[in-house]
């Protein structure tokens, strides 16, 4: 195992914004990245881009100064999930996630896999209920709880297992901060600046609303990546968040 410092060569940002990179083309992705400043956001790399371009793509983003949220949502037997999380830590990412529905043994194994990395370990976050899911989707899976209640149950299990926080909808953030405390990190997709298209997300909020609700890190995709001036869009979002703080 090679222990890799997670931030020694990268810029430090206080922004809660994490930009979701969703590109089919590597050159287009890098052209976008070269327009923005790592002091203004972190970047999220998901399944499609990681499968297409591999760990080297993550390394290239890190070399440009960006902290990386590796959004692969590991969900497997405990041993396999633990090795995958350790591999992400070896890569030096800032954050990695697993599915809370993988259960307590899987999450505990993932957490234990990061112990050797010490202070250089990435944040370990669990996914509760995907923001695209509604009550009818859960019912199809035999879950009779509402998305909010089911997410809270999974978040409680996540905290019990010692993880750093959860991915949840912004609507759940107020309740989660009350129940799980300020140190339990909340990462929220489905964030759209005022006037943006909701896209394929069902439960959305503006950045200002998310900050007020207690969200620690907010994932924003197309409103930034499809902007004619993404650098200015990021600066405007961050300025608005600072005014709202």
Curated annotation (Swiss-Prot):
Binding of substrate, residues: 22, 44, 71-80, 131, 192, 201, 221-222
EC number(s) given by UniProt: 4.1.1.23
Molecular functions (GO terms): orotidine-5'-phosphate decarboxylase activity
A biological process term (GO) from this entry: 'de novo' UMP biosynthetic process
InterPro entries listed in its UniProt record: Aldolase_TIM, OMPdecase, OMPdecase_AS, OMPdecase_bac, OMPdeCOase_dom, RibuloseP-bd_barrel
Keyword DNA-binding: no
PROSITE patterns in UniProt: OMPDECASE
Keyword Flavoprotein: no
Enzyme class: lyase
Catalytic residues, chain numbering: 73 (proton donor)
Catalytic activity: orotidine 5'-phosphate + H(+) = UMP + CO2
Pathway info: Pyrimidine metabolism; UMP biosynthesis via de novo pathway; UMP from orotate: step 2/2
Keywords: Decarboxylase, Lyase, Pyrimidine biosynthesis
Purpose of the protein: Catalyzes the decarboxylation of orotidine 5'-monophosphate (OMP) to uridine 5'-monophosphate (UMP).
Family: Belongs to the OMP decarboxylase family. Type 1 subfamily.
Protein name, per record: Orotidine 5'-phosphate decarboxylase
